[in-house]
Amino acid sequence: MATTTSENVPVFSSLESVYGGDGGSQLEEVQIRYDNLKSKFQQVFGHLPDVFARSPGRVNLIGEHIDYEGYSVLPMAIRQDTIIAIRKHDDSESPKQVRIANLNEEKYAMCTYPADPEQDIDLKNHKWGHYFICGYKGFHEFAKSKGVDVGVPVGLDVLVDGTVPTGSGLSSSAAFVCSSTIALMAVFDVNFPKKEIAQLTCECERHIGTQSGGMDQAISVMAKSGFAALIDFNPIHATDVQLPAGGTFVIAHSLAESQKAVTAATNYNNRVVECRLASIVLGIKLGMKPEEALSKVKTLSDVEGLCVSYADSRGSSNPVLAVKEFLKEEPYTAEDIQEIIQENLESVFSSSSSSLDVLKAAKHFKLFQRASHVYSEAKRVYAFKETVLSKLSDEEMLQKLGDLMNDSHHSCSVLYECSCPELEELVKVCRDNGALGARLTGAGWGGCAVALVKENIVPQFILNLKEQFYQSRIDKGVINKNELGLYVFASNPSSGAAILKV
């Protein structure tokens, strides 16, 4: 394993430097994409773009819903990406506006915003262009904090083309925010270390109301072609992971869209709140005073040491032992928790409007289940890494990795409850057709599954998925048969974010 260094985002003058590993015909397709972007940019805005930026989607191989709890995850970048073409107006040009267009103009109408980094994002009126404004606000805030003068706000013309399926669990939103932020850096002629951009873009996405943990942005920015990555946090750090020979990851969309920003209060952000409450309750049960736990404990990783100490006194090192002892399996009411922590829940989360939205929507809180998932999933990530580093044969290694993926899915489904009927059906079809392991990937509640498949059966495996999962959806008109390649595909680990002057 090699550590990914904190060098700046690379700047390339040829597409081959970024996409070359994909081979001739795919490189030609990429060239057509960029040519189309240039042509459309000229048509829409009357000028050519100054520069391009791209950032890929990702598939998380293992480590779901634990990044925001401070634990490491193991994703890889995929070939599908978001490309931003951008042009900066001269100071004299008016009006001072940020105009954001999309190559898919039928689905995404042009959005126009004031050229004002201080503007608020209207979360009640969800627009696709908000993701660019997340990057816009974050870039200006970060430049200011670094003492970098980017001048008075000027107008910007922006054209977007994304091939990461939306609502797929493959981080289309992170690819959009990362490419937006990097495009802004490029057009203002500044560059920052990758790890700083990964942290910045994670914070950017919070402008849209999603309490992101940072994995999606970190792998999108820091990925290296041919390698998955172990992503650590606080500080963000990436270690290249070489996967065993003979296996391929197949990504398949359940066709249930996961609208993370729209359903945050009942799904994604709800789990963030439940984990925080579980960590505070555990801290108190394990000896902390309530006021100390409330001020110091933010994530389950903050109380892992106390949990392990308790487990150690009983001859174990597993923090789940403390969870089983001190958290009840039945859901907690707000009143139950307030009695333990001696504080009103609204006061605990008073600084987070998205968390307050969760409290308004929640009827109860499943602390035992959420903490059990986080601690067991964190152990699986390191078991995955240790397996890759072991002296097992490739065959044994692939089998072990598949078992870990299956265990992960069970935990996501039963303990974290972030699956859905379509994902359950898809995962079963994958396993029935020879996948060594299959699990939901991404936030869940829709989106994609990832399956570890022996290389020599990949074509037949994909064909079987088409027949046994997708054909009925094609017959019902859910998707077009000609678009099937967008929804199920094999992927090798791809390269990360880049600036392109082509």
Question: Which residue ranges define each predicted feature?
Answer:
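Phosphate-handling active-site elements
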Residues: 142-154, 184-200, 455-468, 472-477
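C-terminal nucleotide
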Residues: 1-58, 62, 70, 83, ...
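Glycine/serine-rich anion-binding loops at beta->alpha junctions
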Residues: 54-69, 161-180, 430, 434-452
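Glycine- and acidic-rich phosphate- and metal-coordinating loops
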Residues: 116, 136-137, 141-164
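DPxDG-like acidic metal-binding loop motif
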Residues: 77-80, 170-190, 453-454
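Alpha/beta catalytic cores of group-transfer enzymes, especially the acyltransferase/condensing modules
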Residues: 191-238, 438-441, 490-495
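Beta-strand segments within the central parallel beta-sheet cores of soluble alpha/beta enzyme folds
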Residues: 99-101, 149-161, 192-203, 400-404, ...
